[in-house]
A protein has these predicted regions:
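Glycine-rich, charged/polar anion/phosphate-binding loops
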Residues: 32-37, 96-100, 196-197
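Flexible glycine/proline-enriched surface loops and loop-helix/loop-strand junctions
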Residues: 30-34, 62-66, 108-110, 180-181
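An aromatic/glycine/proline-enriched structural segment found at the starts
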Residues: 1-57, 213-242
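Active/ligand-binding-proximal structured segments within catalytic/core domains
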Residues: 60-74, 81-83
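A C-terminal, polar beta->alpha supersecondary segment
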Residues: 78-79, 164, 238-241
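Short amphipathic C-terminal alpha-helix that caps PH/PH-like domains
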Residues: 3, 7-8, 69, 125-133
Length: 242
């Protein structure tokens, strides 16, 4: 009530405000058939993104294990993706992967993985990426680092200023009347590496993907790319309108 009083006193509006135009929301598409989109870009390296949407709606009960999986698998330089794709195998300049939460109840979870690599390493990188996504390497040391990093971030982060109202609005879009980070923090310490593996098996393994490649088709192994889905070429005109 105090917030509303202060807002009304200081935020002046027209006597008859204009009607807000209805926003056309982007409708997510369930990925049922594998497709490879390629956009032309003449360079000796490519950027490749895999995206999968199965239609799973928001579930606050999985938030703790979901957050820990993301931290363990694709959260940073100590995560499995970076260590395997860049440090151990030298197959990517950069690599990341995560299962993203919906922003509103009508949306779905999205698994998205991205790599940047040399043209001649693309197929090796894609094969290796598929391997670790579906058969996730298990490391107790990496798990402990991920758990500690997540706990530390939750313990030290602060919601201040305008972020207070935005966090409230974001939670409201998901039907929440509480801070989900509090639940994550309270439960994270009891989760195990076996829990992360179980989550990966249920939520990530063997998904169907749409793959987007930005690169020079003439310098890529397109015959092998076809194994990942029907190829659809996207022109610069389609992307930018000219």
């Amino acid at each position: 009530d105090e917030f509303v009083r202060v807002l009304n006193a200081n935020h002046k509006t027209a006597v008859e405000p204009l009607e807000v135009a209805k926003n056309e929301s982007f409708k997510q598409q369930i990925v049922e058939t594998p497709v490879v989109y390629i956009a032309p870009y003449e360079a000796k390296q490519i950027t490749l993104t895999k995206q999968s949407i199965k239609g799973e709606k928001y579930n606050p009960e999985i938030a703790p294990i979901h957050s820990l999986y993301n931290e363990y698998f694709g959260g940073g330089m100590n995560a499995i993706v970076f260590q395997e794709m860049r440090e151990a195998r030298g197959l990517a300049y950069s690599a990341n992967a995560r299962l993203s939460s919906p922003l509103k109840l009508s949306d779905s979870y999205i698994f998205r993985a991205t790599i940047a690599t040399q043209n001649d390493k693309m197929m090796d990188a894609l094969s290796a990426f598929d391997s670790i996504i579906n058969d996730m390497p298990v490391s107790e040391n990496a798990f402990n680092i991920a758990k500690e990093a997540l706990i530390t971030r939750l313990r030290t982060q602060r919601v201040t200023g305008s972020r207070v109202i935005y966090n409230y609005l974001n939670a409201k879009e998901l039907g929440l009347d509480y801070d989900i980070n509090k639940i994550i923090f309270e439960q994270i310490d009891s989760l195990t590496l076996e829990d992360v593996v179980g989550f990966q098996q249920e939520w990530v393994k063997d998904r169907v993907y749409k793959i987007c490649i930005v690169g020079d088709e003439d310098d890529l192994d397109m015959r092998s790319v076809k194994n990942y889905g029907n190829i659809e070429r996207v022109s610069l005109n389609q992307l930018f309108g000219y």
